[in-house]
Amino acid sequence: MKPDVKICGLKTEEAVEKAVSLGATHVGFIFFEKSPRHIEPDIAGRIAEKARGRAKIVAVTVDADTDDLDDIVYLLKPDILQLHGHESPQQVLTIKALYGLPVMKVFSIREPADLLQIDAYIGIADRFLLDAKAPEGSDLPGGNGVTFDWRLLRDLDAEVDYMLSGGLNKDNVGQALAETAARGLDVSSGVESAPGVKDLERMDQFFAAVRLATATAPVSGSVQ
């Protein structure tokens, strides 16, 4: 089966419609003011209607407090909460109970030890997203356009359901699928002409590359 594909950091109706029409299974909206992809919850809620019922709507937060989460959930009505901060297993459980939504927990990877933290969240988070650790000095936990060594994932338990993120683009996504057991792909900067500006042609190219890769080397997919 084809992998899930999530286009993250969407800010316009045009980009949302394009993502869904190309076959995106997930569309992500980022609520983190330091990011060039940050969007206000009310605006996100309006443009997300283009995707509702056609793709999973994902709210991406970074150590958000309850008041902010309340606003995001109320205005966006997401299908999934993506936690990109330092949320503990107990915090993940609390958030799931509070909002009744599945959680995708993000981990930043650079070296083998970074994968060890996943164990504490198995059976708690509904899915994982494995991203490249941010470069030194970056204010952004993700969306930095850098990859990590995918060979690190070879020893990951095959039962771990994860999306692969970090520097994916049309030129490397085939290699990413060949080298990992990722059941999903998350792309943001790789389909942009500038930080926060989605490029419709690059989105076309990315999906074409995914189709080409999966036609020759199918992977198992999993839609949350």
Swiss-Prot record:
Gene Ontology biological-process annotations: L-tryptophan biosynthetic process
Keyword line: Amino-acid biosynthesis, Aromatic amino acid biosynthesis, Isomerase, Tryptophan biosynthesis
One Pfam family hit: PRAI
Keyword Amino-acid biosynthesis among record annotations: yes
Keyword Isomerase: yes
Family (UniProt): Belongs to the TrpF family.
Name recorded for this polypeptide: N-(5'-phosphoribosyl)anthranilate isomerase
NCBIfam families xref list: PRK01222.1-1
Metabolic or biological pathway, per its Swiss-Prot or TrEMBL entry: Amino-acid biosynthesis; L-tryptophan biosynthesis; L-tryptophan from chorismate: step 3/5
PANTHER family linked to this entry: N-(5'-PHOSPHORIBOSYL)ANTHRANILATE ISOMERASE
Signal peptide region: none
UniProt EC number: 5.3.1.24
SUPFAM superfamilies membership: Ribulose-phoshate binding barrel
Alphabetical list of HAMAP family matching this protein: PRAI (MF_00135)
GO molecular function: phosphoribosylanthranilate isomerase activity
Origin species: Allorhizobium ampelinum (strain ATCC BAA-846 / DSM 112012 / S4)
Known catalytic reactions: N-(5-phospho-beta-D-ribosyl)anthranilate = 1-(2-carboxyphenylamino)-1-deoxy-D-ribulose 5-phosphate
